[in-house]
Amino acid sequence: MSKKGKKYIEAFSKVDKNKFYNIEDAILLLKEIKFAKFDETIDISINLNLKKNHTVRDTIVLPNQFMKPKRILVFAKGDRADEARAFGATYVGDDDLINKIKSGWDEFDVVVATPDMMKDVGRLGPILGKRGLMPNPKTQTVTNNLKDAINSLKKGRTEFRANKNGVISFSFGKSSMDNEKIKENYEEFVKEVVKKRPSDLKGAFIDSIYISSTMGPSIKVNFVWR
């Protein structure tokens, strides 16, 4: 705590660490203790009760978007490439883009590939994998249905996953957003996480939920989903 700034310590002192706040009060408090001068991102941290063999991973489109548009790169050839351009992909190509990325180019936010391109795209594993951008059927980024894939990404479809410690960290709003819209995003996200409960899990799935702003302290949120 001694390494934190005066403003953080003051904000921290206003949070009851032993209290479970309902989401409405948590959002109000988060905004009340805000001290940063920029529009902070609001994050959620969900601690899950998982076994080593459990995987929690999916994608979601939140009801209220807040992030800047993503630069979508699509690996495709022929008619599929033409489709990708028509549907609004930022970059479309095959070997030309593969070589460009190998040379260090990284001005894109998400990568989609048609199944027939994956053998070639696989050569970029060390590069794309490091950024968490390797196309994967589980995240709907390996597909022949480029229209749906691109449209959903334009609407803000984003991947979430639990790390090796069973923690999901995800951004779901901005401090400038209306409180009700922040709440709607929170509820939609938690609902989607609950759907990923492993079928063989015994006991509670969610251990705890916290929300915080970029510069602020964590606030423990009460929840009814198990």
UniProtKB/Swiss-Prot annotation:
Q: Which SUPFAM superfamilies match?
A: Ribosomal protein L1
The UniProt keyword set, sorted, is: Repressor, Ribonucleoprotein, Ribosomal protein, RNA-binding, rRNA-binding, Translation regulation, tRNA-binding
An example Gene Ontology CC term for this record: large ribosomal subunit
GO BP, one annotated term: translation
Q: Which residues form a coiled coil?
A: none
Q: Which GO terms describe its molecular function?
A: rRNA binding; structural constituent of ribosome; tRNA binding
Q: Which domain of life is it from?
A: Bacteria
Keyword set includes Membrane: no
Q: What role is this protein assigned?
A: Binds directly to 23S rRNA. The L1 stalk is quite mobile in the ribosome, and is involved in E site tRNA release. Protein L1 is also a translational repressor protein, it controls the translation of the L11 operon by binding to its mRNA.
Q: How does it assemble?
A: Part of the 50S ribosomal subunit.
Provide the family line: Belongs to the universal ribosomal protein uL1 family.
Protein name in UniProt: Large ribosomal subunit protein uL1
Q: Which organism is it from?
A: Borreliella burgdorferi (strain ATCC 35210 / DSM 4680 / CIP 102532 / B31) (Borrelia burgdorferi)
Q: What is the gene called?
A: rplA
